[in-house]
From Swiss-Prot:
Name listed for the protein in its UniProt record: Decorsin
Subcellular localization(s) per the UniProt record: Secreted
Function in brief: Inhibits fibrinogen interaction with platelet receptors expressed on glycoprotein IIb-IIIa complex. May prevent blood from clotting during either feeding and/or storage of ingested blood.
InterPro entries: Hirudin/antistatin (IPR011061)
Length: 39
């Protein structure tokens, strides 16, 4: 699967992230080994 780009600023597209890089409630943590992403 293609890797998602890293979060940058207020980018609203799906991207790799941590809870400090996304608006509250917008960071998704998929099951398994998938990386979290903004949504």
């Amino acid at each position: 699967a293609p890797r998602l780009p890293q979060c940058q600023g207020d980018d609203q597209e799906k991207c790799l992230c941590n809870k400090d890089e996304c608006p509250p409630g917008q960071c998704r943590f998929p099951r398994g080994d998938a990386d979290p992403y903004c949504e």
